[in-house]
Regions:
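Conserved alpha-helical scaffold segments that buttress catalytic/binding sites
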Residues: 2-285
Length: 285
């Protein structure tokens, strides 16, 4: 049984039974390779969301007009990636089993793997749309196969060649870029090519998992993240891209890599909250 959370994201106050979208938080950052703190992202987004309006002038939609249940954060074992991923996957399976849309709040990007496992088990021929500063395609990081630096490589092992569509990538090892050129639909640096990719996915009528690493944003907009990379996209470019992706059959999604304590101004958390609001409104049917 999934119980209501004490503190919810603004406007996400529906019951589990009546909701079409379910938020679930994964406060995990144990494989962070540079600056930790993403485990505090989900709770910070909830707390600071009350500085937002529920209404989006970008989409002329309001969170009060859609049904979202916030199930809160999972209790995860910080010392075991396998155990944490298993718990996240079970929660995603429970949400999917009830016919709801699972929207995961990270946490570091490794948590996406658990959600993809659950969603791919329900939706064959799954495609993944990936916004990020980093390719995340290493086969291992310092010998670890389960790392935020390897998450899309592990996802590739699930969905296969041509099923991962990557945008905004501007950092990684040479081998990652070479792997991407052979095995993924790779669009470095910007969102160029996104509209064509979306047209193709709509024509194929395939299910899509949508993962947003917030470090796709430029650090001038979003400095509060574990591995900031100069040369990112703007906030408005990201919002336009989210609305474009929402035209496909999105069956699961996540927003990850906010490390709120790394930005004392609070701007990064405010930005993450606004991204989540826009994503919720874009995917709500």
């Amino acid at each position: 049984m999934i119980l209501p959370n004490i503190e919810t994201f603004i406007g996400c106050e529906s019951s589990f039974e009546e909701a079409s979208i379910v938020l679930y938080g994964a406060p995990f950052d144990s494989t962070t390779s540079f600056r930790p703190g993403a485990r505090f992202g989900p709770s910070a987004m909830r707390h600071e969301s009350f500085g937002l309006e529920t209404y989006s002038p970008y989409q002329d939609k309001d969170l009060m007009d859609i049904s979202v249940f916030d199930s809160g954060d999972l209790e995860l074992c910080f010392g075991s990636s396998e155990m944490a991923l298993s718990d996240i996957e079970k929660r995603a399976e429970e949400i999917l089993g009830a016919g709801k849309f699972p929207l995961l709040l990270g946490g570091e990007h490794l948590v996406t793997l658990a959600a993809v496992r659950a969603v791919a088990a329900k939706y064959p021929n799954l495609h993944i749309i990936h916004f990020d500063a980093h390719a995340d395609l290493r086969d291992d990081y310092l010998g670890a196969k389960l790392s935020h630096a390897c998450v899309l490589r592990r996802c590739h092992e699930i969905v296969g060649d041509g099923h991962i569509h990557q945008f905004c990538i501007r950092s990684g090892e040479r081998e990652e870029f070479q792997f991407a050129s052979r095995h993924t639909d790779f669009h470095p640096f910007t969102f160029e090519g996104l509209e064509e990719t979306i047209r193709e996915l709509k024509e194929k009528q395939v299910p899509v998992y949508f993962t947003i690493d917030l470090d796709c944003l430029d650090p001038s907009v979003f400095p509060g993240t574990g591995t900031p990379e100069a040369g990112g996209v703007s906030f408005l470019e990201l919002l336009k891209a989210i609305r474009t992706v929402s035209q496909t059959n999105v069956v699961g999604a996540d927003v990850n890599e906010l490390a709120p304590m790394l930005d004392a101004s609070g701007v990064s958390t405010a930005t993450a909250c606004k991204v989540l609001r826009e994503l919720l409104l874009a995917i709500a049917k």
